[in-house]
Curated annotation (Swiss-Prot):
Superkingdom of origin: Bacteria
Sequence similarity: Belongs to the neocarzinostatin family.
Gene Ontology terms, MF aspect: DNA binding
Protein name, as recorded: Neocarzinostatin
Disulfide-bonded cysteines: 37-47, 88-93
Keywords: Antibiotic, Antimicrobial, Disulfide bond, DNA-binding
UniProt gene name: ncsA
InterPro entries, alphabetized: Neocarzinostatin-like, Neocarzinostatin_fam
Claim: rRNA processing is one of the keywords in the record: no
SUPFAM superfamilies: Actinoxanthin-like
BP terms from Gene Ontology: defense response to bacterium
Function: NCS has antibiotic activity (for Gram-positive bacteria) and antitumor activity (for certain mouse tumors). NCS binds non-covalently to a chromophore which is the cytotoxic and mutagenic component of the antibiotic. The chromophore binds to DNA as a weak intercalator and causes single- and double-strand breaks.
Length: 113
């Protein structure tokens, strides 16, 4: 089965809310970066490395951690290029998990008050 992610809560968020991020169907024993990102252009994802968290999937391919989400953040591309300020009240922000190769479940959309 394809890997899945859940974020609780995922809507009605305030700046600095701590959400629970869980993954299932992940590669057992693989480390995943957990972070908040936004599609800022077609195929371009800018993320917030300042609040990244890391988690390793257990033998069943499950993982869970907490993450602080921001209404706006300093966005960086995967190659480390600074994108600029991302405002989640206008951008499509999400929380996701990805391994070192960029593989992981689809990101979960989040929304702020």
């Amino acid at each position: 089965a394809a890997p899945t992610a859940t974020v609780t809560p995922s809507s009605g968020l305030s700046d600095g809310t701590v959400v629970k991020v869980a993954g299932a169907g992940l590669q057992a024993g693989t480390a995943y970066d957990v972070g908040q990102c936004a599609w800022v252009d077609t195929g371009v994802l800018a993320c917030n490395p300042a609040d990244f968290s890391s988690v390793t999937a257990d033998a069943n391919g499950s993982a869970s951690t907490s993450l602080t989400v921001r209404r706006s953040f300093e966005g960086f591309l995967f190659d480390g290029t600074r994108w600029g300020t991302v405002d989640c009240t206008t951008a499509a922000c999400q929380v996701g998990l990805s391994d070192a190769a960029g593989n992981g479940p689809e990101g979960v959309a989040i929304s702020f008050n």
